[in-house]
């Protein structure tokens, strides 16, 4: 179920502070975040975030198309190694 419109988007407070500090400094450094549940806001466009996937921080360059989505959508947590092949079918 979607979040109620009257509540507004969810963003962790520390994330807003880090984004504002990064914009003020003018440096294009990666902002490390653990909050995969936070919504991407328009003020984050152009910034690079390192989103933690449980193993390492994956760099995510925020574009206008990402606004309204969650950070976790752009940092996959699982690696698909493929299905095992059927040995009987290969022998043919």
Curated annotation (Swiss-Prot):
Pfam families: Ribosomal_S19 (PF00203). One of its GO terms (molecular function) is rRNA binding. One of its GO terms (biological process) is translation. It comes from the Bacteria. One of its GO terms (cellular component) is small ribosomal subunit. The keyword Iron does not apply. Keywords: Ribonucleoprotein, Ribosomal protein, RNA-binding, rRNA-binding. PROSITE patterns: RIBOSOMAL_S19. The keyword RNA-binding applies. HAMAP family: Ribosomal_uS19. Belongs to the universal ribosomal protein uS19 family. Protein S19 forms a complex with S13 that binds strongly to the 16S ribosomal RNA. This is Small ribosomal subunit protein uS19. It comes from Gluconacetobacter diazotrophicus (strain ATCC 49037 / DSM 5601 / CCUG 37298 / CIP 103539 / LMG 7603 / PAl5).
């Amino acid at each position: 179920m979607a979040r109620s419109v009257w509540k507004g988007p969810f963003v962790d407070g520390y994330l807003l502070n880090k984004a504002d500090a990064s914009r003020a400094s003018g440096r294009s450094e990666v902002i490390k975040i653990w909050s995969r549940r936070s919504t991407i806001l328009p003020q984050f466009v152009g910034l690079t975030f390192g989103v933690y996937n449980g193993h390492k921080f994956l760099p995510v360059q925020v574009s206008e198309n990402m606004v309204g989505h969650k950070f976790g959508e752009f940092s996959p947590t699982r690696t698909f190694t493929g299905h095992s092949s059927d040995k009987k079918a290969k022998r043919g």
